[in-house]
Amino acid sequence: MSDLPGIVVTGASGRMGQMLMKTVLASGRARLVGAVERPGSDWVGRDAGAAMGGAAIGVTVTDDPLAAFAQAQAVIDFTAPEATVQFAELAAQARAVHVIGTTGLEPAHLERLAWAAHHAVIVRAGNMSLGVNLLTRLTQKVAEALDEDWDIEVVEAHHRMKVDAPSGTALMLGEAAARGRGVDLAQARVSGRDGITGPRAPGSIGFSAIRGGDIVGEHDVIFAAAGERITLRHVATDRAIFARGALKAALWGQDRRPGQYDMMDVLGL
């Protein structure tokens, strides 16, 4: 067992953090060697297994990420932008693969990730599931095949606690559509219409976000023309798909050179 890659999970007390830890523990392909929480969390100092309501697993939750990363081969991180860029710098110091599922990253955050990627492997994706990444590739292909007579809209739905919109996955799909069209998403993007908006701008890519209940994640890419419509759809019903994808990325990154990668690289798409 000791020759299996050691994994640290950040944001251990959150829903994704707990799912990630359970996935690593059940995988048989990696070891959970660390769990990180913010200072002041009531999880700090507790056994991670016991904190999740199960048996002790011999991993104590810590608020010292560098010490945890130093004993790991990979860090899996679904937290918040400011925390993620700090973790990226520390993971680079430890030369640990950093798998990032955090969304809502701004250009300034991405600049710091680019620096960290000079020293360590970073795998970052708005969505870690196989199905969504296949949807992304299909979206680009369909956008390549259809002209501007086909309007493109991305509609996403998530649980009421999600704090950013559009979702990272929706933006990933929008980027794929923009690549297919050969345009810059920043110029084509229209988010959340309200009031008197006037006619739809030709070539624009629209985004709409729904928040409610416990929706895990739903994404539709709509290609609409006069008299016909194509809808590409992915529905997530279990967060385990993201955890399994993140673990796959952490294992894949073990043999790679420092740099930035995404799930398309991991899946060979």
UniProtKB/Swiss-Prot annotation:
EC code(s) of this entry: 1.17.1.8
Pathway: Amino-acid biosynthesis; L-lysine biosynthesis via DAP pathway; (S)-tetrahydrodipicolinate from L-aspartate: step 4/4
Residues annotated as catalytic: H158, K162
Transmembrane feature ranges: none
One Pfam family, short name: DapB_C
Entry superkingdom: Bacteria
Entry binding sites for NADP(+): R38
Annotated (S)-2,3,4,5-tetrahydrodipicolinate binding sites: H159, G168, T169
Binding site for NAD(+): G11, A12, S13, G14, R15, M16, E37, G101, T102, T103, A125, G126, N127, M128
Protein name (Swiss-Prot/TrEMBL): 4-hydroxy-tetrahydrodipicolinate reductase
Origin species: Cereibacter sphaeroides (strain KD131 / KCTC 12085)
